[in-house]
């Protein structure tokens, strides 16, 4: 099992490359983007030292499936998936915010709530809520899109408009799409015995039209609970059974790492790496309802290059 942690392609018409935390994005002729989902894994805004075999393939295939399942809600950037780890799409001018939508009080929102915070991103939260409780209606809590190495910051709708990050008309569309996509994601999850707890969407503009970009409803961008036993666990105040990369965050915290200054990432043994890979495969199969088919990992970069070149030559 090999993992792809860095790419250095030179595709025809390539103008630039951006290396994100997990994805490497190649700009082709200022018209298309070749997005490679690597096997890098990040937690607490830090890229961990070891890659996770098959993770990129899983994320790319889940995102492609959900992009295809939501084209009636809003246009999206995807044109093709020439390789299991690659999506090629329309180059959009991205909004510098991530649209986060939460159906339940958990994660960072719960940590803030527990400490007395009753307003997140300008959204007032009801009193007396418990961890993992469902909100009366899903709430939208955007964040800024941080540069590599910096943390994303919460931002309110008012601040987004005041800073000119989106016009009122644009923001209304972003919010409408966000809630409609979350509703669809929730319905698809329910068919699989899952609860879509929270997720994030990114949008951009192309020729004046707002497009959904990047990945959607993947375990990297979303948190899922198992529906079975949710209510009992909630009533007893027990931790929910999660389908997300929370298990990676928990392992890091148990080993004294929370992404804070001066903390060192714990050593990731082959056994830890393999167990994370297996958990991701479980996520894939639960979320999609399909068996995960492992691609040959003997020479991933060569395979990707060949497949993308063939697509671009069309």
UniProtKB/Swiss-Prot annotation:
Q: Please give the catalytic activity noted in the UniProt record.
A: 5-amino-1-(5-phospho-D-ribosyl)imidazole-4-carboxylate + L-aspartate + ATP = (2S)-2-[5-amino-1-(5-phospho-beta-D-ribosyl)imidazole-4-carboxamido]succinate + ADP + phosphate + 2 H(+)
Q: What is its EC number?
A: 6.3.2.6
Q: Which cysteines are joined by disulfide bonds?
A: none
Return one GO MF term: ATP binding
Q: Which GO terms describe its cellular component?
A: cytoplasm
Which controlled-vocabulary keywords does the entry list?
ATP-binding, Ligase, Nucleotide-binding, Purine biosynthesis
Give the top-rank taxon of the lineage listed in the UniProt record for this protein. Bacteria
The enzyme's first-digit EC class, named in words, is ligase
Which CDD domains does the protein's record reference? Answer: SAICAR_synt_Sc
Please name the pathway. Answer: Purine metabolism; IMP biosynthesis via de novo pathway; 5-amino-1-(5-phospho-D-ribosyl)imidazole-4-carboxamide from 5-amino-1-(5-phospho-D-ribosyl)imidazole-4-carboxylate: step 1/2
Pfam families tied to this protein: SAICAR_synt (PF01259)
Name-wise, this protein is Phosphoribosylaminoimidazole-succinocarboxamide synthase
Give the organism, scientific name.
Bacteroides fragilis (strain ATCC 25285 / DSM 2151 / CCUG 4856 / JCM 11019 / LMG 10263 / NCTC 9343 / Onslow / VPI 2553 / EN-2)
